[in-house]
Amino acid sequence: MTTSTPQTMYEKLWQTHLVEATKGETPLLYVDRHLIHEVTSPQAFANLRFHNRPVRHPERTIATMDHNISTRSIKIDAAGEGAANQLRALAINCKDFGIELFDMGHKNQGIAHVIGPELGLTLPGTIIVCGDSHTATHGAFGALAFGIGTSEVEHVFATQTLRQNKAKTMKIEVKGHVGAGISAKDIILAIIGKTGSAGATGYVVEYCGEAIEALSMEERMTVCNMSIEFGAKAGLIAPDQTTFDYVEGKEYAPKGEVFEQAVVDWKNLKSDADAQFDAVLTLDAKDIKAQVTWGTNPGQVISVDGTVPSPEDFSDPVEKESCVSALNYMGLTAGTKMTDIHVNKVFIGSCTNSRIEDLRAAAGVVQKYEGQQVVKTIDAIIVPGSYRVKEQAESEGLDKIFTDAGFEWRLPGCSMCLGMNDDVLEEGDRCASTSNRNFEGRQGRGSRTHLVSPEMAAAAAITGHFVDLNA
């Protein structure tokens, strides 16, 4: 549909997927790709059976086992009876409804938001949904991707559509280039630190600027992955040659002339020069330093060369009270140097930072410590995001770099990102984690989570505390 009014990328994606927009009703959008897993799909399948409905387009749905599985064993019951029941249910449901499943031990199994891109299931210009809040990851490709609830999972199963109200638009521009050693995780944590944990509520965010354009696809995924952590419905990055090169040749991606024509279309998938956004935020890349969260939401973050803030540093009474609560839960004292905070657990993994580039970066830091071992009082685990990532890392010898230094090398899965499997922290454990959420109890009851980059996590494992790698 052509229009004389300049449009944002989000508005273009919305318009091309709009099925119905009846006055007084919630608009209806077409869904191109539906990713499912064992946790948010059982009730949706049960309702389909109750109403005797088929999955309308099973070929547009892909299932994987990721949240509840053990990363120590491929046995379906290794993470407990409850998890095993959900995993068995997924296998039965996929068979009954004709949905392709990457189950335990399958060469394509992995975290949904890792396997989608690496297999070419994630494509620019599409709408992608999943019953998981970090579906925004796929926005790195210029796809409108967002998490949905179980009732919405059922709606997509039955109709391949979804009712959605149109969001507001926000542009976040990161000007210039980041300094040496600054990662994509640092960029997104710095953004969240500036906006606060609810700063983009009600918006779809488009990331742009030289610092964003310079990122690899895997780094862009890290940025978009955490869009929900400051309230955004979704995060978008305009597709470019970096995107096209990444997608080309992937197993499920278009091939030959079909791919070439797709690229022609994808090149137009960007915000028009004069498009108006409802909100604009600008950051200077050179000001971004390595980040560490100190509190109990991702917005409570500071550079590693800083100190734990005091409640008196906040003028807003809500933020002041939040700081008091966070310091109490985290067992921290205001004024403590971030580099003086010691950890006893390290987790490198999750849909935020478990791809091959993340593992290479972490291994590179381990090598810089020239034979030093993980501190004896620390348990450190490396969890690749998929079997393909695992195999690639092993072919490069990364697993040996980690295990020789005292890290555990695990099987793919969501693992310690969330307390939903057998990788759970105990009360009082303090973890340097490459995941995306540091809420109270997120990694286990009473657990204390500090969100960091893979590089920072690896350094913390070797030294026992947070390190300013650029000092």
Curated annotation (Swiss-Prot):
UniProt record, GO biological process: L-leucine biosynthetic process
Keywords: 4Fe-4S, Amino-acid biosynthesis, Branched-chain amino acid biosynthesis, Iron, Iron-sulfur, Leucine biosynthesis, Lyase, Metal-binding
Pfam families: Aconitase (PF00330)
Cofactor binding summary note: Binds 1 [4Fe-4S] cluster per subunit.
Top-level taxonomic group: Bacteria
Catalytic reaction list: (2R,3S)-3-isopropylmalate = (2S)-2-isopropylmalate
CDD domains in the cross-refs: IPMI (cd01583)
Residues that bind [4Fe-4S] cluster: 351, 414, 417
Any one Gene Ontology molecular-function term assigned to this protein's record: 4 iron, 4 sulfur cluster binding
Enzyme class label: lyase
EC number assigned by the record: 4.2.1.33
CC cofactor: [4Fe-4S] cluster
Pathway membership: Amino-acid biosynthesis; L-leucine biosynthesis; L-leucine from 3-methyl-2-oxobutanoate: step 2/4
Listed PANTHER family: 3-ISOPROPYLMALATE DEHYDRATASE, HOMOACONITASE, MITOCHONDRIAL-RELATED
Subunit structure and binding partners: Heterodimer of LeuC and LeuD.
Function: Catalyzes the isomerization between 2-isopropylmalate and 3-isopropylmalate, via the formation of 2-isopropylmaleate.
NCBIfam families assigned to the protein according to its UniProt record, in alphabetical order: leuC, PRK05478.1, PRK12466.1
Family: Belongs to the aconitase/IPM isomerase family. LeuC type 1 subfamily.
Name of the protein in question: 3-isopropylmalate dehydratase large subunit
Origin organism lineage: Bacteria, Pseudomonadati, Pseudomonadota, Gammaproteobacteria, Alteromonadales
Encoding gene (name): leuC
